[in-house]
Amino acid sequence: LTGYRTTQRTTIEGVGRRFPLERRPEDIFALGFLARGAVNRDSKDLGELQIGAVETVSTAFMGMTVGCAKCHDHMYDPIRQKDFYAMKALFDPLVIKKQTLASPAELVLYGQQVEAFSKKREAAEAPIAALTEPYRKKLYADRVAVLPPDVQAVINKSEKLRTRAEQKIADDYFPVLRIDNDKIEEVMSEQDKQKYKALRETLNQINGPTRREMVKDLPAFWTVEVDRGLEREPSYILTSGDPERPEKNNPVEPGWPFYSGQPDFREGRVEAFSDWLTANDNPLFARVAINRLWQWHFGEGLHKASSDYGIMGGRPGNPPLLDWLASEFIARNYSMKQMHKLIMTSEVYRRASSGDRKLMEKNLAIDPANRYLASFRLQRLEAEPIWDSILSAAGNLDTSLGGPSFDIENRAPRRGAAPTPEAKMNRRGAYIVRGFSTNREIVPNFLQSFDVEDGRAPCPIRTQTVTAPQGLFFMNSPEIEKASTMFADRLSKEPLPVAVDLGYRIALNRPPTPAEKDQSLTYLANDPKRLKSFAWLLFNLDEFLYIQ
């Protein structure tokens, strides 16, 4: 959506058969959208992936709330339960996989690195096993000896010869007989204990820093691919949406609402659906997408319920404008860049949020909600532009494209990995790591404070709250402390009058008023070292946070 839609994805042979071209990297990345849902990627039950895909794709790209139809026909819109599961059938053949971004040569090198590391680790583990095994056997024998004789007989019996009941007894006693390393260390001689600690320290070094030096992890990401075996299996309506309870007497064919023809699935189910969705004679996707773009620029969409174009979502405030923008979006080959330019160079976007008081009051009386945008709707910057603005003012923003995400709280991305180097913490806010995990909170406090969702469910529009954590971030966070210092260093290279003028222009995109300039110069004249406090003050002005 940031560039152009590729309209020609297949070649057509003379006999009329369609053959998919080799997938481009951006196509594989795009499919990763379906793997980013709130699903357990290690689970064998993939029903949650398909159901989540239906709900998210229909909401995000079609402006429909179809969740009701998972259990029954939609109560308001013409969407049947059968339509929901026909859409689910589109995604039924998809399975989650981890896609490695590496060339064949890189894969060979990685295999060599892993093999060399494994040999080094095995060499470090061997003396530990030799040292601990006699102690382990003695502790095990001592624990078995205090068990009842009939239990001892079961434990000493070969696992292959045990009956099912005997195996149950052995399993029940396993926690009692398990010998942990700390128990072994307790009974070691002092000499062996010192030797064991040294060996463990060496192994820990190998598993940590040494592994990171020897084995360079290949870049990879989660995506989906088509399982051809699943593609041949039938799909069914699910009782109450439960993947474990398919109604075998209610099979469904792949399809989607609002399409009465016969889909051509020779290229693929998802491909056929996406071709229909983005066809030039189908304005649905274009309306939904361009409304979201308008919402992002103006704080509210032309259709206020940007994810619900059904009966309960109401009607657009300006249908002709929405239709015209959708037609322009299609005519410009679905180029978001061109639509950004069209909107941002328009007269309505360049209006100010304040102006002649009498005229503002008159407009407010006619249009209290400012639906006709007589003036610009005052709105706070989102979290990511706030981050970018802070670093840009400090002269420390890295605008390079691509690369891994970073965590501003400098947590390791996974166990055993290294935190983000300080040099990589000045990237644009779009690269701040966010999301969810089954075992830890990933969304940084900064993003949470400024209303960024964790991504578990579609978020058609972020809330605009005003809370104490937001003010505290700008008052005393380490990020603002560092940015204020760098901003002050940037201004200190200029004479004070120029520094004051430059500070206002950089932070607020306007020159200071005469009163502001006089007050700033009076404050700084007594002590030029106050430039850091001056920079901090500019960060804490409402104008820095709000688009006016």
Write out the residue ranges for each language-model feature.
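Primarily short, surface-exposed interaction patches in extracytoplasmic proteins
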Residues: L1-F19, D45-Q50, S58, D77-P78, ...
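Sequence context surrounding c-type heme c attachment/ligation sites in exported
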Residues: T6, F19-E122, V443, L447, ...
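Residues that flank catalytic or metal-binding motifs in active/ligand-binding sites
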Residues: E13, F29-A30, D83, D150, ...
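Acidic helix/loop microenvironments that form the catalytic cleft of cell-wall polysaccharide enzymes
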Residues: G32, Y85-P93, R143, P148-P149, ...
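Short His/Asp/Glu-rich catalytic/ion-coordination signatures at enzyme active sites or charged loops
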Residues: G37-D45, L90-A123, R143-K195, A507
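Hydrophobic stripe of amphipathic alpha-helices that form coiled-coil interfaces
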Residues: L94, A124-P127, L131-P134, K138, ...
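A structural supersecondary motif
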Residues: T438-R440, Q448-P458
